[in-house]
Amino acid sequence: MVLPVKVLFVIPGEAQGSSMIFARRQAESLAREGVEVDLFHLRSRTSPWELARESARFRRRVRSFDPQVIHAHFGTVTALFAAWAAPSRPLVITFRGSDLNGAQSLRGVAGQVFSQVAALCADRIVCVSRQLRERLWWRRGSAVILPSGVDPELFCPEPRWQARQRLGWSYDERVVLFNAGHDPAVKRLDLAKEALALTQGLLTGLRMEVLDGAIPPARVPDLMNAADCLLLTSDREGSPTVIQEALACNLPVISVDVGDTVERLRGVRHSAIVPRDASAIAIELARVLRTPTRSDGRNKVGEFSAPRIAGELCRIYRELAAERSEDSAWNTSPY
């Protein structure tokens, strides 16, 4: 009988809300694969005093749960914290985007340096896209490419009118979905609005539905099925989960070349990669919106389905657990 692997996720931020929802959903997928997962939410990443308190809380969790593997779901301070607070436990780090390609501010550069140092401490490195892996200063060759993944049973196509009925939307309007998240400046909401205004000069009955961090995650599948198109204009991305969710629902996507969007949209009908220019975006939006045709993006869901990603992570965890078991006679630390 194979005993389940015990994995402790380290996730930045509070447990509530939509922040890092993809990490929590990944834990659910792993549980379905037989992995025993516990979640530790790192509440503060800036205050040394709070980090010291969090370290004590984290060590108590490690002692009580006794994980075979620790998985940090972000770089920067989150990954360094996991490496420092439990140095004898095998560590997996998933780099997700702004931890390796953040803003060129003092804080952004510091975060990138912390991420690069943390990469030296990891037993396994996961990057959500090839483009992000290229940002590593070292250990690129050993880093695994695994997007966050989406649940194909949660995100699946259904008639647009049914989704609109649940949301209370008009059946006649054209709706462009835009994910502003917690950082509208990086997502380039300004560019999206400029492109939409130009498109409104070409089409009538058009509006934008902007998603922010306050949108309940359970509502997102309905939004994907109710909208006519997803627009993505970000300056920086890792592997935007919103693109994967849209593809799983056959929602047409118009996106700039950022993160792994070119790879994700390659061969998908009724979707396009566009220059980061409002006029070019407007022309493509108008083309897609004139005919209410869905994409065939669901044909690609096998590349990023949650069960496939969970299976790959299970393999990594079991390798690390086996290595730790072999070394256990030499390690008496509870951390």
Describe the predicted segments one by one.
Residues 8, 169-187, 193-196:
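Conserved donor-binding/catalytic core segment of Leloir-type glycosyltransferases
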Residues 69, 85-102, 125-126:
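Active-site proximal beta-strand in glycosyltransferases
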Residues 72-78:
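Short His-centered aromatic/hydrophobic patch
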Residues 93, 116, 120-160:
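Donor nucleotide-sugar binding/catalytic pocket of nucleotide-sugar-dependent glycosyltransferases
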Residues 222-227:
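Short alpha-helical donor nucleotide-sugar binding micro-motif in glycosyltransferases
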Residues 235:
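Aromatic "clamp/platform" in nucleotide-sugar-dependent glycosyltransferases that forms part
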Residues 243, 252-255:
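Short hydrophobic beta-strand element within catalytic cores of glycosyltransferases
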Residues 267-279, 286-290:
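Conserved acidic donor-binding segment of nucleotide-sugar-dependent glycosyltransferases
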